[in-house]
Amino acid sequence: MSPTTPRSVEPSGLKPEQLPPSYFTWPGLLGRLGNGQELSEAQVRWAMNEIMEGNATDAQIAAFAFGIRVRGITAAELAAAAETMTSFATPVDFSDVPNCVDIVGTGGDGHHTVNISTMASFVVSAAGVPVVKHGNRAASSKCGGADMLEALGLDIERSPEDIRQDAHDTGFAFMFAKTYHPAMRFAGPVRSQLGAPTIFNLLGPMTNPAYPKFGLIGCAFKEFMPIMGGAFARQGSRVLVVRGMDGMDEISVCTPTEVVTVDAAGRTGEEVINPRNVGLDFYEDGSLVGGDAEYNADVAVRLMKGEISGAIKDAVLINAAGALTAVRGWEENGFQETLREQVQIAREALESGAALKQMEKIVGKEF
């Protein structure tokens, strides 16, 4: 756990003890935000430490979390906040699970879809790539990834030892954010009271305690896509940060999808995904709408059994392909060609029945 007094050296070259007394105080920090100034990484770490240790008041948490988002967070600030928050998480060692990937989004897109990323996770793991999914219950929709997995029969509150074993046995592990980020209990009530996106929406996808090096990251907020990409680059991750032009925090099959790519060398780029360019199709808005946990779980079972085609199937395939592209890399063959190849790999995993068997193995029962 990080100390309350930051040890980092400021850009000016001054050490913390040489800085003004107000530098590491809420009035000083919030004053900088109010004036439109950037915070140093040390100030962000100090603020996150205060929040995670339970030393900050609700008013201070709200002012920081909402204020830094409204002012416009930088990649350096976001990376510092993510690093500090993850240092308070329950640690899990996945160093012996190579090439694991997370498929996760910020939420808050208002589309209330079926659980695309969770279904895509079954397909990805069936294709031989381990998934360490970091998720939670629904916040603004009827059913989050944790809700659907629980409805399928998975015990979501599993110990670090259990999920390590899950990853080895099945190629899939689910880390329930509420369990693995206990310090977030200090910020949770404020987030609920605000009812508006804050820095914590961006931090959720960046604070997987397993530290996966690869990810398909949905971002519902267009203006923060390059910021998240820059922060992931600082973490040394290879990811795709995606947002459908319909606002969906997934790769959409209702519109093209904008992508910020972060490659293995930390270079960022931009792409656009068109489903028709990878052998899939476009569908009407609303064709991915889901329901409660039982409904979405039933959709997952029917999809894996081959009883569902069309929009939901294509959405799962293209998002699974996005995650596989992040793991396998696009530097050699180009992004679009790599994605097209991975769609076919995802299709084989789903249509062969391998994804159904994988889901049954993960939840421990047959459907």
From Swiss-Prot:
Cofactor(s) the protein needs: Mg(2+)
UniProt catalytic activity: N-(5-phospho-beta-D-ribosyl)anthranilate + diphosphate = 5-phospho-alpha-D-ribose 1-diphosphate + anthranilate
Metabolic or biological pathway, per its Swiss-Prot or TrEMBL entry: Amino-acid biosynthesis; L-tryptophan biosynthesis; L-tryptophan from chorismate: step 2/5
Parts of the chain that traverse the membrane: none
InterPro entries per UniProt: Anthranilate_Pribosyl_Tfrase (IPR005940), Glycosyl_Trfase_fam3 (IPR000312), Glycosyl_Trfase_fam3_N_dom (IPR017459), Glycosyl_Trfase_fam3_N_dom_sf (IPR036320), Nuc_phospho_transferase (IPR035902)
Residues that bind 5-phospho-alpha-D-ribose 1-diphosphate: 105, 108-109, 113, 115-118, 133-141, 145
Sites where the protein binds Mg(2+) 2: 249-250
Binding site for Mg(2+) 1: 117, 250
Keywords: Amino-acid biosynthesis, Aromatic amino acid biosynthesis, Glycosyltransferase, Magnesium, Metal-binding, Transferase, Tryptophan biosynthesis
EC number: 2.4.2.18
GO CC terms: cytosol
Cofactor binding, per record: Binds 2 magnesium ions per monomer.
Binding-site residues, anthranilate 2: 191
Binding site for anthranilate 1: 105, 136
Pfam families hit by this protein: Glycos_trans_3N (PF02885), Glycos_transf_3 (PF00591)
Family to which the UniProt record says this protein belongs: Belongs to the anthranilate phosphoribosyltransferase family.
Subunit organization: Homodimer.
Function: Catalyzes the transfer of the phosphoribosyl group of 5-phosphorylribose-1-pyrophosphate (PRPP) to anthranilate to yield N-(5'-phosphoribosyl)-anthranilate (PRA).
Protein name according to UniProt: Anthranilate phosphoribosyltransferase
Originating organism: Corynebacterium jeikeium (strain K411)
